[in-house]
């Protein structure tokens, strides 16, 4: 839900942002590009962080990136600040997506498909609710800043839940499933067929 909620907030609010700070659509595109750049980079590093520091760490880090990103984004007035903070939001969203999928796959090995479908259904619910709520708030005169700040009422409790939630212990990997360190990862990537 959180991923769909935050991911779809930008689409509804970008026209209000451009109007509020006097940006053109080119600068708006730069802002949106920055979020997806953060998301893209998170797809490479979230799994590695989960392997090195644990699944809980990567999920909590995702929540913290979202909190800091939203606070900064809602307070921004210069393009560089918007770009930096929405990049942080993108990192949080990418880490959240990968960490959530990773945890669900590990916990529900027998019924992965069912639980991954549920995860995506909740993404869809967040994606549907967000434009409706954000559009309503914009229509009654709220600023995009207020809308992003209100999103903290969703992000903060979920992040606190990530912190206090108990995660099942990973089973000890056998020799075939041992963790890959960074040097091994570079070797695998640089091998030629």
Describe the predicted segments one by one.
Residues 110-111, 115-167:
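Helix-loop-helix hairpin linking two adjacent transmembrane segments in secondary transporters
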Residues 41-80:
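Conserved MFS/SLC helix-loop-helix module at the cytosolic interface between two early adjacent transmembrane helices
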Residues 85-121:
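Cytoplasmic helix-loop-helix junction between adjacent transmembrane helices
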Residues 16, 47-48, 136:
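Membrane-interface helix termini in secondary transporters
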Residues 4, 8, 90-98, 128:
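Small-residue-rich segments within alpha-helical transmembrane domains of MFS-like 12-TM solute carriers
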Residues 8, 35-44, 127-128:
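Residue-level signature of mid-helix packing/kink "hotspots" within the transmembrane helices
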Residues 1-18, 23:
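Extracytoplasmic
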Residues 163-184:
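Flexible cytoplasmic inter-helical loops of multi-pass small-molecule transporters
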